[in-house]
């Protein structure tokens, strides 16, 4: 008989201690934009190549003509109940932003908040070990961090990397005629929602863990390709939100082919059964006015396209002649489902789904 159980490992369940999980617990994009508008403009720093004036994945500071520092931080509440897996997912997700800038990680610091009077100490230790294991896989030290006693469990990393300042890849700079390539299948938010509702079987759980703990290492290699014009990763704002950011930053329209999108197992069926996250609706509220969805698409298309991804795949905008080399880089690192999902065309900061 096939085991259909999903590991929980803790009592109480980690996901029962938080009101959200993974990148789905980001502040809603509309509210975040309003909050950031209230901040004072950042003073000019000539060596700050990427700062907070754009919606990019990390900050980049030039040290010299050959080296720039990539700095980012990312943390969230549990998306799964297994503490080791939670630590792995959070660490993989944090390092992804370094790769998404074309950088190579150098070291990381842990961000830890745990209800220490609620969770057994061995559970908290397992979360930390999960993060350590991913840093070891990435070949970097987890060199320190900071911890607090918090009501809800949170874990993540400050990730520091290095990149050639001439090779920084941004979520802008795409060119008309570029091809869009996605590195990982979609649907993590829906699978995590199914897990909370005890609707996810062992196979679905395994697929989710495999996707969310796979390091986006091809990003560091993609930075060396002249044909790669823009790069980002798909996380809490969903495929539509992050593709729209790339389109706006490039002053173009992204055309996404719905039939070509890769999905994790069971995601479409779960969406049809009404399983989704609240972040999906918040994403649509923020971006829907700039999205074209034909009436011929399935009724679940909007939910699927706005599904928040945790530790999602890289989105590459590259010249047509670079497609084979980009796909070869992905597949050499085990990203067998990397595929072409659309193209960039003339327009003014929209996403058109066809």
UniProtKB/Swiss-Prot annotation:
CDD domains, alphabetically? SelD
Alphabetical list of Pfam families matching this protein: AIRS (PF00586), AIRS_C (PF02769)
Does the keyword field hold Hydrolase? no
Q: Which UniProt keywords apply?
A: ATP-binding, Kinase, Magnesium, Metal-binding, Nucleotide-binding, Selenium, Transferase
Instruction: Identify the InterPro entries for this entry.
Output: PurM-like_C_dom, PurM-like_C_sf, PurM-like_N, PurM-like_N_sf, SelD_I, SPS/SelD
What's noted on cofactor binding? Binds 1 Mg(2+) ion per monomer.
Reaction equations catalysed: hydrogenselenide + ATP + H2O = selenophosphate + AMP + phosphate + 2 H(+)
* The protein's Enzyme Commission number: 2.7.9.3
Q: Which domain of life is it from?
A: Bacteria
Its Gene Ontology molecular function terms? ATP binding; magnesium ion binding; selenide, water dikinase activity
UniProt key word Kinase: yes
User: Per the entry, which co-factors are needed?
Assistant: Mg(2+)
According to its UniProt entry, the protein's GO biological process terms are: selenocysteine biosynthetic process
What residues does ATP bind to?
A: 26, 54-56, 74, 97, 145-147
UniProt binding sites for Mg(2+): 57, 97, 233
Site positions (Important for catalytic activity) are 26
Its GO CC terms are: cytoplasm
Q: What binding partners and quaternary form does the record give?
A: Homodimer.
The family assignment reads:
Belongs to the selenophosphate synthase 1 family. Class I subfamily.
Q: What does this protein do?
A: Synthesizes selenophosphate from selenide and ATP.
Please state what the protein is called.
Selenide, water dikinase
Instruction: Tell me the organism.
Output: Paraburkholderia xenovorans (strain LB400)
Gene that encodes the chain: selD
